[in-house]
Amino acid sequence: MQKSKKIKIVKWIFMALLIVMFLAFVVPIPMNNVYDAIEIKLDDPNYLVKCQVKIYGKYHMNIFTDDMFDGKIVVSDYKLTNEKMSKMYFSDDGWPLEYIYVAEHDTEGRSNRDTYFLGRLYSKSWFRQMSIIVFSDNPVNKNEGGKAEGSWGDWNENDGYCIVPLANTREEALNILTKNELIRSNP
């Protein structure tokens, strides 16, 4: 009788664990994090701007595909990052940070939306080891509304801009970028 009681308890514990695991992959997890960060320019040792990266929204864990984040990633000094953001996936190749804003209204008063790409976010799941590479035309337009004409530019590891949360110095930022394989070695 004791043995069957233990088996029942083990079955109930196993079922409870299965339910918790199932819920973890079905129910999105709310996030509201603020990270102190720095922005650097790879070819300019004197360029270092302190900023904040605010992340709020819902994190979706996935067993068979990349995890997904649905919410906002706001970078101080980049005005258009306050706009609606497209869903972001945690891919090994990074994911574009795409924001949608109202560009103008047509003759009937309907909103015409445009897209703003800040850059690409490289991160492990749960925003661990996060780095943002900033497309070249964005730093020029930081506080001016960010509405560049045409392409948002590109990025390269020689003279690109990077936003690195949890780094306090240029050396720390370069080490994180090297560890994340975004640059080959400290320039």
Where are these regions (language model features)?
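Charged, amphipathic alpha-helical segments
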Residues: 17-18, 48-57, 109-116
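Short, solvent-exposed secondary-structure boundary motifs
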Residues: 42-47, 79, 106-112
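Non-cytosolic head/periplasmic domains of membrane-anchored proteins
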Residues: 87-187
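Hydrophobic membrane-insertion alpha-helices, especially the h-region
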Residues: 8-28
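Short, Lys/Arg-rich N-terminal segment immediately upstream of the first membrane anchor
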Residues: 1-7
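Extracytoplasmic/periplasmic/luminal assembly and interaction segments
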Residues: 45, 50-101
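A short, compositionally biased
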Residues: 25-34, 66-69
